[in-house]
């Protein structure tokens, strides 16, 4: 059974972060991670042709695929120390620090805010920095 479906409360923020990161690493399709009406807001200039604010899993998957095509070997990971603010027993906001490494191009760090409802991400705000920052301890 899906660990998020079993425990969609404050106990499971790392599971959401893991699925979100796996999606960016193309280990899970966006259709298994985000809701049909999920919007993703990026806080940086586009690096690939993409919608300004992708809507739903199909558009988000297209963004992920375009990035992976342009930057082969790109790898995302997140800091295991996440922050969680519940709205209810089945929804809340997760804050995570992440970094992305591109072979031959170094590492960048970012912050994502993920809103979830049940087992799906319903909204995301993603900010990428130009410098690598240390993870929180």
Predicted regions mapped to residue ranges:
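C-terminal and inter-domain tail/linker signature
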Residues: 1-137
């Amino acid at each position: 059974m899906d660990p998020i479906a079993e425990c969609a409360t404050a106990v499971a923020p790392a599971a959401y972060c893991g699925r979100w990161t796996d999606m960016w690493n193309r280990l899970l399709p966006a259709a298994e991670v985000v809701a049909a009406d999920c919007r993703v807001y990026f806080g940086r200039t586009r690096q690939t042709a993409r919608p300004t604010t992708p809507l739903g899993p199909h558009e988000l998957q297209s963004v992920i695929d375009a990035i992976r095509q342009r930057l082969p070997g790109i790898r995302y990971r997140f800091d295991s120390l996440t922050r969680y603010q519940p709205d209810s027993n089945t929804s809340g906001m997760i804050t995570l620090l992440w970094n992305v490494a591109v072979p031959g191009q170094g590492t960048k760090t970012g912050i994502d805010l993920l809103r979830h409802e049940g087992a799906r991400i319903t909204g995301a705000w993603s900010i990428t920095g130009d410098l690598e920052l240390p993870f929180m301890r």
